[in-house]
Swiss-Prot record:
F-type ATPases have 2 components, CF(1) - the catalytic core - and CF(0) - the membrane proton channel. CF(1) has five subunits: alpha(3), beta(3), gamma(1), delta(1), epsilon(1). CF(0) has three main subunits: a(1), b(2) and c(9-12). The alpha and beta chains form an alternating ring which encloses part of the gamma chain. CF(1) is attached to CF(0) by a central stalk formed by the gamma and epsilon chains, while a peripheral stalk is formed by the delta and b chains. ATP binds at residues 153-160. GO terms for cellular component: plasma membrane; proton-transporting ATP synthase complex. It is found in: Cell inner membrane. Keywords: ATP synthesis, ATP-binding, Cell inner membrane, Cell membrane, CF(1), Hydrogen ion transport, Ion transport, Membrane, Nucleotide-binding, Translocase, Transport. PROSITE patterns: ATPASE_ALPHA_BETA (PS00152). It is a peripheral membrane protein. This is ATP synthase subunit beta. It catalyses: ATP + H2O + 4 H(+)(in) = ADP + phosphate + 5 H(+)(out). PANTHER family: ATP SYNTHASE, ATP SYNTHASE SUBUNIT BETA, MITOCHONDRIAL. InterPro entries: AAA+_ATPase, ATP-synt_VA_C, ATP_synth_F1_bsu, ATPase_a/bsu_AS, ATPase_alpha/beta_chains, ATPase_F1/V1/A1_a/bsu_N, ATPase_F1/V1/A1_a/bsu_N_sf, ATPase_F1/V1/A1_a/bsu_nucl-bd.
Amino acid sequence: MSTAALVEGKIVQCIGAVIDVEFPRDSMPKIYDALILDGSELTLEVQQQLGDGVVRTICLGASDGLRRGLTVKNTAKPISVPVGKPTLGRIMDVLGRPIDEAGPIDSDVTRSIHQKAPAFDELSPSTELLETGIKVIDLICPFAKGGKVGLFGGAGVGKTVNMMELINNIAKEHGGYSVFAGVGERTREGNDFYHEMKDSNVLDKVALVYGQMNEPPGNRLRVALTGLTMAEHFRDEGLDVLFFVDNIYRFTLAGTEVSALLGRMPSAVGYQPTLAEEMGKLQERITSTKKGSITSVQAVYVPADDLTDPSPATTFGHLDATVVLSRDIASLGIYPAVDPLDSTSRQIDPNVIGEEHYSITRRVQQTLQRYKELRDIIAILGMDELSPEDKLSVARARKIQRFLSQPFHVAEVFTGSPGKYVPLKETIRGFKMIVDGECDHLPEQAFYMVGTIDEAFEKAKKIQ
């Protein structure tokens, strides 16, 4: 450690998670330098230089017991976390310290959590599809390998369950390494996830970084960067890595909490004025280069189910595929509650997914859109007033709607029905049969919570 690392300062003000520290004028810390409280492990991160030797910092940990006059040392470098294989199978906090009581992490390599995004000429876009085994996603909003996916939804519509199923289906089949960043989510979910990974013997391929709801805003603001730094290291070593974030909204919210304490004027709906920049800095780093790829799945909480809220609206622009979860569909008992008319993907292009897949997707969406338009008429006048073509459209749309539901492996404990993984070919074949009218004679309840179309035929026999 250099001599500058030993420069000491004194705390001059504490307001919640924001601490002001005074240093000698000729050796002020730089922005993002990590400061350590003398005699403890508490870390502060420099956010602003106020002049006269005073810097404003965010406390990455509880600020209980801090007072004016305490000594703080400057490490003269940003927060660095351990990276590489020793992090696999471990649970770490925002500073890369283990919190799973399984001993220290013996990694020789550390890396700063603040990195520049890769240069444009290093990027490597991919059109290779990533099969998830979830019918509605593979059909309507297919994922690309090395792409970015957002799961948007309000409270309680199934973002975390969908993400767990994706981890279950992709991470277990994938064989490569995964990084999971729990940003401001429930501790219970983090615990469940750890045991789920352990029971399915894939824990040795996953690095877990948690900054849960009960932690100070500084931790929640930086934990996504810690997880991303670990994923970037695997990518730069030439590996294909999966990066899961639950939940990006809490990252924004932590920024909002900190922003007000730093004395910035709030912007729309009380968010920080630097919302777009903070989101951009994070998202631009989650990308695939010529060395390796990062495929990321991010859960995005939508406050009050309003997709125009600045936080989800800012996230939309950075993603390759958006999976929108709808409360209306969840209220019908159809899970996963993905809205097939609102969800989109850049991969929906006949040159990428093939002519057959493209045409089936569009026909399914047209049928569902027609049903949506006719719903008001049906509510007022009933089905009898519709033309024969419209009656057929409605019947097929209701079958499609039910066929888009699917039992999940991770929900077996709650539902009692075994989870289903449906290959893409089977998904396309099933929906093709419905829109071509080959299933018109089957009752619509036969399509609810089944895997392939063959299961729907079997279920219909039992019903009849």
